[in-house]
Amino acid sequence: MPSVRKEFGGECWTCSEQARDEFGLYWIRGAPGDGIHTDPDTILHGMNSGHQAINLACVFGAKRILLLGYDCQHTGGKSHWHGDHPRTLGNARCVAAWAKGFKQQAIHARLRDIEIVNCSRATALQCFPRSTITEAL
């Protein structure tokens, strides 16, 4: 994490109090479930960091969110575009369950007039409108 903090100029957020304390990250309360939480101090984890990132964007007031790398499938036999995580972190074993969570999130976003566009090149997600990143920008 220290090398990421050096190279990445943006904010780093976590739902883990341990990671907050160990790495000096911004912290927000995480709760189990799918969709978008109604409490602005809490995000729903949806069993994956992509779900959490959408929730965090909503907390920050985003009205349009463009998704990249949301494949929700094992594209090319890989569990992640960046390679496997260490064993302790897990490696995308429940992508079908993630898709169900994103479907709930899409419903919540529409109810809040938040546009979410999936600009991922390869994806199993059908719940968000699709576009290329070039067209969406």
Question: Where are the regions that the model predicts?
Answer:
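Metal-ion/cofactor- or nucleotide/acyl-coenzyme-handling active-site neighborhoods
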Residues: 1-137
